[in-house]
């Protein structure tokens, strides 16, 4: 068995089936192996960053890791995607091709080894594990340690640097007998015991106004339906953090929507004004998004806090916690469902969910289109199998406000690290993981200009994605903060760009909507497209400035 054979075996056992990136001679032997294995699909991206975001979207939608292959400068291009996966606890395998071991530190072209450019230090900062294979003697142990980290909790990216001359080298005979040890075994934390479940349910029974908040830390646990069933038994209102949106449906009678930035205020009102007397937080980091930039209101929080997170360092970091439970969201909800039933109580102060299309939708000037008009038109026309991916910028706020989550697991966004353009390629990864669903990505024109070339990837692989692009000719999130203090043109204006024409040039369908009277027909045509399609919507730049409620 060679090093390459062992690596492919570990990838297969870890459930990796999608490998994306750009071709590199440093990994040619490995790519040949993968191409000959029917269990792997190779996706040729147009940019290494796009490959990383595609793998990210696939993992979020499927719960399984994907692999990314890069080399040389491509390894620096993928860093933002790796950092994004790290912040959001998304499992991903990054394979970087290295020069031959004998060339380390000799100023060989594109030497990114620790003796060259030293990119390993950067990957170690963002990855759960980063290893560099430097000899046959330690190849197996280093590869195995990386895959153990890939399966560990909290989830996250791992990195393996593989010199091109070692891929085809045979492992020492004494290592072959242990090559299969531990393959595919996902290390999970032991479920919390009945004592913890009894304690939580006891506190719940004694509370008058409890609240459950679900964060991104439990997204990959797939507990949406289970936790809602428990909430129904107890009459327990629930919300998500901005980064956890999509775990549960927002149209449920017990839903309070989103707590913090981008929320409609119902969850914040219930927490602080009711006031809530028991806050159960699962997979929540209590960072700036959920606390509205660490609003002073949180210092006066009256609720008893139960914090569940597999990362012990997250418990009590900002919010005073009376009970910390270090376990996964899945283990926690399983323990609750195995415990004694909670006492049902109709809770106080729960306002009904906001309607999907708010009456009196604001209109832009003349025939210009307000972003909420687009959101409500999309929401009206979306099929039951639709999944929304929101990119970064003002578009994400309009998406939160205008399109409610109707089914769990049908909304994806990267709100925490927020790399612009991540949703463009991420939507392709989601569609690759869920071919039976219609994936719609909502993005701004600035982000689209960064990673819009990945449309070509969707065209090449026949992947159906619809991109709805808010085109206002500016970086709106940058223009808002400086307006009134300087001319925003130097830092925000990107000019008029025909993105529908760009889509057609890349082989996709492109639809341009300039006026309100064209909006409904344009949306209907875009959603009816059977392949990759870009809906390019002209948005009034003076209107595209949502209030996200920082510090309230």
UniProtKB/Swiss-Prot annotation:
Catalytic activity: 2 pyruvate + H(+) = (2S)-2-acetolactate + CO2
Residues at which thiamine diphosphate binds: 48
EC number: 2.2.1.6
GO terms assigned for molecular function: acetolactate synthase activity; flavin adenine dinucleotide binding; magnesium ion binding; thiamine pyrophosphate binding
Binding positions (Mg(2+)): 445
GO biological process entries: isoleucine biosynthetic process; L-valine biosynthetic process
Name recorded for this polypeptide: Putative acetolactate synthase large subunit IlvB2
High-level lineage: Bacteria, Bacillati, Actinomycetota, Actinomycetes, Mycobacteriales
